[in-house]
Amino acid sequence: MAIRVYKPTTAGRRNASVSDFSELTRSTPEKSLVRKKSKTGGRNSYGRITSRHRGGGHKRQYRLIDFKRWDKDGVPAKVAEIEYDPNRSARIALLHFADGEKRYIIAPKGIKQGDVIETGAQADIKPGNNLPLKNIPTGTVVHAIELRPLGGAKIARSAGAAVQLVAKDGAYAQLRMPSGEIRNVDARCRATVGEVGNEDHANIQLGKAGRARWIGHRPITRGESMNPVDHPHGGRTRGGKPPVSPWGKGEVRTRRPKKASNKMIVRRRPSGKNRK
């Protein structure tokens, strides 16, 4: 993937950039793997805002992605197409399996049309192949990792994401997350070899507010600039209280200190200026 930078013909085009989409091989999705996706505008079933700053945006269709893959052990698949997915930052790859079935997966870096991908404990260690962590050599970079055996991929699914398998200790594998955290995961959990493609996605500059609206992002207004009736931070009186949401919920360090999964964390992610 490469980034195309616009010439500054207008204020909105100055410094704006876009993907050149050169890796894509098809512009329309596989019809059998597409479902309707309704917009919520950040509202729940009562019509109340539960997720702020969402709404509008271009219409989308949801592409069904195979995050499990374990039911295709031993069945090779050919990469038929590399496609755009409006619902995620990564590209997706359309696989044609030897048994005739078609499925989408997240497209790993370096994968191309015509490549053959395998699933199962005996699969080779090459980008796109999916196998248990216990069968992957230490030091390998992986993505689309399960947190529980057969639970489906949960970790490292966005563009450019990569996790390194740093050690194996009995029934657990130690993973170094993109945040720097080192975490134990059941060695029976599956992962896909390689890193997620479209790694230059983080370098794209929207350039204008309108492009943010196209993807469904609404403006953010600081609570401090509101009136007291609209937000706890509103009004001219400053300081004296910790930052909160418009409904008075704490907005800083909201992770539960006794979370059950804490015992799986070997080393917490670096904080503050030590973060990379």
UniProtKB/Swiss-Prot annotation:
Biased composition range(s): Basic residues: 255-276
Entry keyword set: Ribonucleoprotein, Ribosomal protein, RNA-binding, rRNA-binding
Domain of life where this protein originates: Bacteria
InterPro entries tied to this protein: NA-bd_OB-fold, Rib_uL2_dom2, Ribosomal_uL2, Ribosomal_uL2_bac/org-type, Ribosomal_uL2_C, Ribosomal_uL2_dom3, Ribosomal_uL2_RNA-bd_dom, Translation_prot_SH3-like_sf
Pfam families hit by this protein: Ribosomal_L2, Ribosomal_L2_C
Region of interest (Disordered), residue spans: 14-58, 221-276
BP GO terms, sorted: cytoplasmic translation
Gene Ontology MF: a single term: transferase activity
SMART domains in the record: Ribosomal_L2, Ribosomal_L2_C
CC terms in the record's Gene Ontology section: large ribosomal subunit
Compositionally biased spans, kind Polar residues: 16-27
Function as written in the Swiss-Prot or TrEMBL entry: One of the primary rRNA binding proteins. Required for association of the 30S and 50S subunits to form the 70S ribosome, for tRNA binding and peptide bond formation. It has been suggested to have peptidyltransferase activity; this is somewhat controversial. Makes several contacts with the 16S rRNA in the 70S ribosome.
Complex and partners: Part of the 50S ribosomal subunit. Forms a bridge to the 30S subunit in the 70S ribosome.
Stated family: Belongs to the universal ribosomal protein uL2 family.
Record's protein name: Large ribosomal subunit protein uL2
Organism of provenance: Bifidobacterium longum subsp. infantis (strain ATCC 15697 / DSM 20088 / JCM 1222 / NCTC 11817 / S12)
Species classification: Bacteria, Bacillati, Actinomycetota, Actinomycetes, Bifidobacteriales
